[in-house]
């Protein structure tokens, strides 16, 4: 009697919930495999419709970070007027080296045609090599000369302007905490050429308080220490 009542209830449930796969077999047992398959399909379908609530961490790219630093307000604390002359010298050597390299194939062609001697060809090659070495040496020196230095309003970021290999202005942004003071760098405050050193890198740049001009001594002291 109890088995008949249970079968009747199962048949009643299977009519109302056919999507869940309830079936009453003659023996009165539910097909568990069929029910498990339909439940898995239902969960998979629900998983497709569920929105993705996972959180994503926004990554700060170096370009956006540099753009943020460039948009800050800076005050000039040091200027080197002779940087314009160094820029002109760098571009002149670049132009001279370019002309020499362009003329070298012409001299070689004239030598093949018998219109230029071996001595002229050797001199042309020597001049081209010398121009290349001089260009590299001058550019190596000029790129390490500080043209201007600025300090932001919070006095935490130092903007350093110098020349690139092509003679263009280039700005780098250095945390003040990363700058080595004059007392720790080993330079005497009375020296003509001082070193701009950082804790995070071995690259060294150079500036001069004699040939250059300290615009804001108080802000300059915040970065490099007192000049007195």
Swiss-Prot record:
Disulfide bonding pattern of the chain: none
Sequence ranges on the Mitochondrial intermembrane membrane side: 113-118
A Pfam family assignment: TMEM70
Listed transmembrane segments: 94-112, 119-141
Family recorded in the similarity comment: Belongs to the TMEM186 family.
Organism: Danio rerio
Localization annotation: Mitochondrion inner membrane
Residues in the Mitochondrial matrix compartment per record: 1-93, 142-228
Lineage: Eukaryota, Metazoa, Chordata, Craniata, Vertebrata
Keywords associated with the record: Membrane, Mitochondrion, Mitochondrion inner membrane, Transmembrane, Transmembrane helix
Stated role: May be required for efficient assembly of the mitochondrial complex I.
Any single GO CC term annotated in Swiss-Prot or TrEMBL for this entry: mitochondrion
Family matches, as InterPro entries: Tmem186, TMEM70/TMEM186/TMEM223
Protein name (Swiss-Prot/TrEMBL): Transmembrane protein 186
UniProt keyword Mitochondrion present: yes
GO aspect biological process, one term: mitochondrial respiratory chain complex I assembly
Membrane topology qualifier: Multi-pass membrane protein
């Amino acid at each position: 009697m109890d088995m008949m009542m249970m079968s009747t209830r199962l048949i009643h449930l299977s009519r109302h919930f056919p999507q869940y796969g309830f079936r009453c077999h003659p023996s009165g047992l539910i097909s568990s495999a069929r029910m498990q398959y339909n439940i898995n399909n239902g969960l998979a379908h629900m998983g497709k419709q569920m929105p993705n609530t996972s959180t994503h961490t926004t990554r700060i790219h170096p370009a956006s970070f540099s753009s943020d630093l460039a948009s800050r307000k800076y005050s000039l604390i040091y200027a080197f007027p002779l940087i314009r002359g160094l820029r002109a010298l760098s571009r002149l050597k670049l132009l001279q080296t370019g002309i020499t390299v362009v003329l070298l194939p012409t001299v070689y062609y004239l030598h093949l045609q018998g219109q230029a001697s071996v001595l002229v060809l050797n001199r042309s090659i020597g001049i081209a090599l010398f121009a290349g070495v001089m260009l590299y040496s001058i550019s190596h020196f000029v790129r390490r000369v500080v043209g201007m230095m600025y300090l932001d309003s919070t006095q935490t970021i130092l903007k350093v302007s110098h020349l690139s290999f092509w003679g263009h202005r280039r700005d780098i942004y250095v945390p003040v905490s990363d700058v080595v003071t004059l007392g720790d760098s080993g330079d005497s405050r009375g020296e003509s050429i001082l070193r701009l050193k950082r804790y995070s890198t071995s690259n060294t740049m150079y500036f001069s308080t004699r040939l250059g001009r300290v615009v804001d001594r108080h802000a300059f002291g915040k970065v490099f220490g007192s000049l007195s």
